[in-house]
From Swiss-Prot:
Keyword Protein biosynthesis appears in the UniProt entry: no
SMART domains named among the record's database cross-references: Gp_dh_N (SM00846)
Descriptive protein name: Glyceraldehyde-3-phosphate dehydrogenase
Domain of life assignment: Bacteria
Catalytic residues (UniProt): 151 (nucleophile)
Protein function: Catalyzes the oxidative phosphorylation of glyceraldehyde 3-phosphate (G3P) to 1,3-bisphosphoglycerate (BPG) using the cofactor NAD. The first reaction step involves the formation of a hemiacetal intermediate between G3P and a cysteine residue, and this hemiacetal intermediate is then oxidized to a thioester, with concomitant reduction of NAD to NADH. The reduced NADH is then exchanged with the second NAD, and the thioester is attacked by a nucleophilic inorganic phosphate to produce BPG.
Annotated site (Activates thiol group during catalysis): 178
Any coiled-coil regions, as ranges: none
Main location: cytoplasm
The keyword S-adenosyl-L-methionine is annotated on this UniProt entry: no
Residues reported in the UniProt entry to bind NAD(+): 12-13, 35, 79, 121, 315
Amino acid sequence: MTIKIGINGFGRIGRMVFRAAIANFKDIEVVAINDLLEPDYLAYMLKYDSVHGRFDGEVSVDGNTLVVNGKKIRLTAVKDPAELKWGEVGADVVVESTGIFLTKEGAQKHIDAGAKKVIMSAPSKDDTPMFVYGVNHGTYKGEAIISNASCTTNCLAPVAKVLNDKWGIKRGLMTTVHAATATQKTVDGPSNKDWRGGRGILENIIPSSTGAAKAVGVVIPQLNKKLTGMSFRVPTSDVSVVDLTVELEKAASYDEICAEMKAQSQGALKGVLGYTEDKVVATDFRGDARTSIFDAEAGIALDGTFIKVVSWYDNEWGYSNKVLEMARVVAK
């Protein structure tokens, strides 16, 4: 069965979802894209990417149609999702990647326009069910509108799950050292809500807030109110790393923790959690479709119950691949 996807918002994640569908998901077909940019410019942005390189395929525009490798994709430039007529293209799932419609009320407009299901490519701003593929996707019960959480939650949740399932997490703090995103400015500029966020990313390490750790408590209810975290935005274009420091309920050696991470990466969490003992750095994970790659050489332990684990993630490519894994789940 071919799953037909619509994409609302052709920014970083929208374009990476499209590329991932072409590269890794032969059962998924993108049938429509909605974005306010001109068709020629959308094609250009798809063809050329400063982080992930040139698109491997043929891209052209015919009026309001994007033609990719001979397949026609409807293009629209509509502000109100209720007017998108997803039913006309048979969209099974709409990926909501504008960052705007992050409530059930907003996403419902896609359903009203004919979409069967909606996946928000960001944490929801209400009680919309949140899923991390590999961690709690098995609890999906047919909801029409879901959130795929954040890229950082997709990295943190698998390692937190392994630790909690085996030894129990009493409490923990997370820091993500996060590549720059579209919210960063190249030079200092106005940012009313987040003054630090308005400083130029080329010259700075910028402390920032993140709800990623608290969101793990939604995805893994046993960890509710046990984790919180913060972020440092750094002058890199892609690939981020989670540093999770926890107090365990039961004692474990660091070697035992590494062994369990390795076992899970080859077992139940294969394709989601990775494991490495190599002397790696950020760019080594660019283009990695897994959302959390445990770095055995980077973590440390103070004693049996106080440990720090480190896990890498391509915050664009890995996350976008898991959006499509969730699309498979909700389309069944």
